[in-house]
Each structure stands twice: as C-alpha cells, then as structure tokens.
Amino acid sequence: MQKNILVLGAGAWGTALALQLAYRGHNVRINSWKAEHNEQMLEDNNNHKYLPSIEKFPSRLKAIQDWQANIIEFDSILVATPSSGFKNTVLELKECILPQQNIISATKGFCHDSYALLSEIAEDILPTTKFALLTGPSFAKELANQLPTAVVVASKDINYARYVQELFSNENFRCYTTTDIIGAQVGGAVKNVLAITAGIAAGMEFGVNAHAALITRGLAEIKKLGLKLGANSETFIGLSCLGDLLLTCSDNQSRNRRFGLYLGQGMTIQQALKEVNNVVEGYFTAKAVYNLAKKHNVEMPLVFATYRILYEAADPRDIVKELMTRQLKNEN
C-alpha cells in the first residue's frame, strides 16, 4: 500500500513521522511554514534544526515549498503543527483539499481561542473530510532512530482508523486503533500540563514519592474531565493517556517537563521558555484546561495549581502546601 503523503509541520515530531512514513515505503513531502527552513531542508536533505541525529532524509522523503499548488499529488495530509497553528492550517486546507483526500492529525492540545478539541475544529471547517488522530507515548528522536514505539490512531470512523494504522505500522512502530477520539485527545493534551507539574516537583527535589502521587492523581483529573466531555473510561488506562502521561512526566526529553524543571529551580516563566527554546504546549494548554474545567464544574487541583503558577505568579511552595493540606477525602 504505497501512498503519497503531505506532512504540514516540520518540527521534530512532524519530521519523525515523515521519516516513519518514508521507512514504511510511502512517498512523503514535508513543509515548514518558514520559507528559510524549507530552503535548508531542500538544500541539505535533512532537518538538522530539529532532528540533528538524522544525517540525511531517505530517498522517499523530500521538503516541498508550494504544497498548495501540488495538493493533487497527495492521498493524505498529516498535520503536525503546534496547536496554535492547527486551525489556520485546516483553514488553508479548506481552500484546496480534494474530496478524496483525508486528514491525520499529530497535534496535541486544544484550540487556543475557543478551547475546542482539535477534531471539533477540523469537523467544523471540513465536515465531509475523514479525520484521524495519531497520539501516544512517543518522543520524536526515538521514533526517528527507529526504536520500538507504540501509539494509538483515533477516529470516529473505525475503517479510516484502520487505514491509518496500516499506513504507519511496521516492525518498529505499532499502531492500535480506537473510536474514542475525545478521550485520546484529552489524554494527549492534559498530560502536557501535568508534565510541567512533574517538572516543577523535580526541580524542587520533592522525590519519587511525590512523582508517583502526581502521576496517579493527575490521571484521575484527566479522567474526570474526559468523562465530562464524553470520553470512554477505558481510554484513560491506555497509550493515549496513561502511557503518554508516564512518558512525558518522567523523562527530560519532554519540553514540558524541562520547562517545569526550570521553574522549580527558580527561573521565571520567560527565562524557562527561553531555556527550552521550543514550543511548550503545556503552557498554553493549561489555560484551555483550566477554563474547560471551570465551565464543566470539574475539580482538577493539580491543573488549577499549575495554572496559578503559570498565570497568576503563585509561589510553587505555597501551592504545594495548599495541595497537601486540602480537606481530607476518599480516594475515589
């Protein structure tokens, strides 16, 4: 099943997925929204800016400048932009996408202005276009280096989910399917906020007891919000939630965890963002999750605490004391 795939978004994650598709035998073209970045990839045949460990792209992967003019060449479009650029990317696609083409999203987060799920944004703009989400515990560098990785493909259309599953899967990359696109998105987005929380705790040297408690209670918070939004309970113990939460909270390859680590060590927000020097999705997602939880009357103490640190200049040590001395309660 050889296909022609367009990848929009040439960060580390978009590039790693483009590499995976090329290794799988597909013809892949990748585009960055920055013209100079495209020129670098075309000239050097690599993406050293985001994946320096990959010396050269395989023969089936090349950069492309004017993707709109060449849209007819592609079977599927993979969107791997930051969440801030997702809506505008889909709006661009609306102007040129063909009826037989479909979309795969590798973006995690919520819409920054409406706090809607990204699938809702895509369905609103392109109501007749098939949509799937690829999510789960996966660092770009490890995938690019063909280390074993397992993820989930979520779509309301199980047949389309299976199509995407076949598109990506090989001996190094295993895709499972689900129709719970809400749960898969909530897990993949909120874990970025909790990774910041975990980083703050690590930066303050709180130890592994606190780390374990944070992941466990954080999972409970994700589940509460997800169920309120219409997700299935089983999704939250799978790869898209628990798996991704464990990965992102526990390893400094995570930009969100590193950002939190710097905050816990005493840096300001701006200093920490500058030190990470890349998009920290959890910083923006914290505001969306906070507002969604308030709207739906969902108690999320860890998320609320992280929001206060990020947006209300709360002192992390005061926040920890408040969390630990809240009214005692039953675990469930």
Curated annotation (Swiss-Prot):
Protein biosynthesis recorded as keyword: no
Active site: 191 (proton acceptor)
Family in the record: Belongs to the NAD-dependent glycerol-3-phosphate dehydrogenase family.
Catalytic class of the enzyme: oxidoreductase
Residues that bind NADPH: 13, 34, 108, 140, 255, 279, 281
HAMAP family listed in its UniProt record: NAD_Glyc3P_dehydrog
Catalytic activity: sn-glycerol 3-phosphate + NAD(+) = dihydroxyacetone phosphate + NADH + H(+); sn-glycerol 3-phosphate + NADP(+) = dihydroxyacetone phosphate + NADPH + H(+)
Gene that specifies this protein: gpsA
Protein name: Glycerol-3-phosphate dehydrogenase [NAD(P)+]
Primary location: cytoplasm
Pfam families: NAD_Gly3P_dh_C (PF07479), NAD_Gly3P_dh_N (PF01210)
Ligand binding (sn-glycerol 3-phosphate): 108, 136, 138, 191, 244, 254-256
InterPro entries: 6-PGluconate_DH-like_C_sf, 6PGD_dom2, G3P_DH_NAD-dep, G3P_DH_NAD-dep_C, G3P_DH_NAD-dep_N, NAD(P)-bd_dom_sf
Function comment: Catalyzes the reduction of the glycolytic intermediate dihydroxyacetone phosphate (DHAP) to sn-glycerol 3-phosphate (G3P), the key precursor for phospholipid synthesis.
